[in-house]
Amino acid sequence: MNTMEAKHQKCFGPAFVEEWGLELYRHRVLDLWNNINLYSDLRGINRFQGLYVTLAYVNANITPVGDLEPLKRWLDVTEKCSNAALIRYMEDDDSPILQKTLHWSQKASELILTMPISERCPFAGVEETLSYASEFCDIVVVSSANSDAVSEEWERYGLSYYTSLVLSQNAGSKEYCIGQFLEMGYEKSKVLMVGDGLDDLEAARNQGVLFYPITIRRETECWDRLQNFALDSFLDGRYAGDYANKLIYEMESALSSDYET
């Protein structure tokens, strides 16, 4: 879905500035938020993980934002990074940082639901690719986003018709979800994960499955290539190797390790 930029620029980032009272540094903090969550090698990480990285950077380089340790402890022990998991954890630890984190996440989710439909649509070529792939493959959505938003977006555009299952943040990590499907009997060489972030790549590699990258700012081109060449290459058993590595290198090169530019 072509929603990530709009969600971060208009929902997650502004809600972050508001929740932590960072109006004095608004422009710098919003740029920082976008660089970390959209354009860095952390692109695609869960909202709570992105929040912690951003808070830690702000705390060290811009202005104090309070004790971050309770948030770090939760992220270290939780199996699922979701509002529901955080609420359960807060039954034993309702530290101020966790209260603010939950309020920020809920506010961001509310803002996402108010986004214009024009800003929550698929990239060109996605439906055609899914339609073609569904003739030969079981398609499963594995997302780190909020479950309500994921389901609503995929159903609105009829994309869920092509899928066998839609999983979101409360199903567990992407790596965990892939592992569950492998336990159902899918051969690793016959599983292709499609993603646009290094967390997607890491999840695929850790589970030993193949990976097809969607490179930022070249999304339409990547979806077209998947439909017209890479998918057939995968189905024929020719995708792994130099060709896949070349595409992955292109995606990695498009992401920065600098949080402020």
Model-found features: residue ranges?
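Catalytic P-loop NTPase motifs of RecA-like helicase/translocase cores
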Residues: 1-2, 201
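C-terminal cap/substrate-recognition subdomain and adjoining C-terminal extension
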Residues: 118-138, 145-261
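Alpha-helical substrate-recognition element adjacent to the catalytic core
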Residues: 2-151, 242
